[in-house]
Swiss-Prot record:
Protein name as annotated: Small ribosomal subunit protein uS4
NCBIfam families tied to this protein: PRK05327.1 (NF003717), rpsD_bact (TIGR01017)
Gene Ontology terms: biological process: ribosomal small subunit biogenesis; translation
InterPro entries, per database record: Ribosomal_uS4, Ribosomal_uS4_bac-type, Ribosomal_uS4_CS, Ribosomal_uS4_N, S4_RNA-bd, S4_RNA-bd_sf
Stretches of the chain forming a coiled coil according to its record: none
Organism lineage: Bacteria, Fusobacteriati, Fusobacteriota, Fusobacteriia, Fusobacteriales
Species name: Fusobacterium nucleatum subsp. nucleatum (strain ATCC 25586 / DSM 15643 / BCRC 10681 / CIP 101130 / JCM 8532 / KCTC 2640 / LMG 13131 / VPI 4355)
GO molecular function: rRNA binding; structural constituent of ribosome
Length: 195
């Protein structure tokens, strides 16, 4: 399986992302890149926005393109549907519910089989949850220290409901752009793929 092993701070600096979004509590001491004062081309801004979304959601190009194409086929605004599909991925829902401190940690928790959806264990990070689904930590994993610590600080968005005592959460509605925890201009991504 292909993985992005690039240093997080280096990539954050290149894309103009605050590392806190990714759960990294460090900051880079490096100066601004030499060509940072140049006005980027239209293509460069579109590419950067796409790369930012891919990096934050930890999705490779092939999978990201498939998600985009699926969103483009659906009726409605393509960019908002794309955001909805990315937010409804199981690894992201686990992170947003507060079972993990970062999206990367959430991906590992899912792939190690600590999460169940509607009572059935799911270990596929790209699994897409639906409205009404109940995402929970399996019984054996409720005393894993990482999950316990993460749930204490959890503040889920409005589209999710968290039950701290039961280590479970419910999807109340589909996420919208307002529910994002970072700035994303989805129209630039749509323009990039519709060239």
């Amino acid at each position: 399986m292909a993985r992005n092993r690039q240093p997080v701070l280096k990539k954050c600096r290149a894309l103009g992302i605050d590392p806190v979004i990714l759960g990294v509590k460090k900051s880079s001491n490096r100066q601004i890149r030499p060509n940072a004062n140049k006005k980027p081309t239209e293509y460069a801004t579109q590419l950067r926005e796409k790369q930012k979304a891919k990096f934050i959601y930890n999705v490779m190009e092939k999978q990201f393109r498939k998600i985009y194409e699926e969103a483009a086929r659906k009726l409605g605004v393509t960019g908002l549907t794309l955001i909805e599909y990315l937010e409804r991925r199981l690894e992201n829902v686990v992170y947003r519910l507060g079972f993990a401190k970062t999206r990367r940690q959430a991906r590992q928790i899912v792939s190690h089989g600590h999460i169940a959806v509607n009572g059935r264990r799911v270990n596929i990070a790209s699994f897409r949850v639906k409205v009404g689904d109940i995402v929970s930590v399996i019984e054996n994993s409720k005393n894993v220290e990482l999950i316990k610590l993460a749930v204490e600080d959890a503040t889920p968005p409005a589209w999710l409901e968290l039950d701290r005592a039961a280590f479970s959460g419910k999807v109340l509605q589909n996420p919208t752009k307002d529910d994002l925890d970072f700035d994303l201009n989805e129209s630039l991504i749509v323009e990039f793929y519709s060239r």
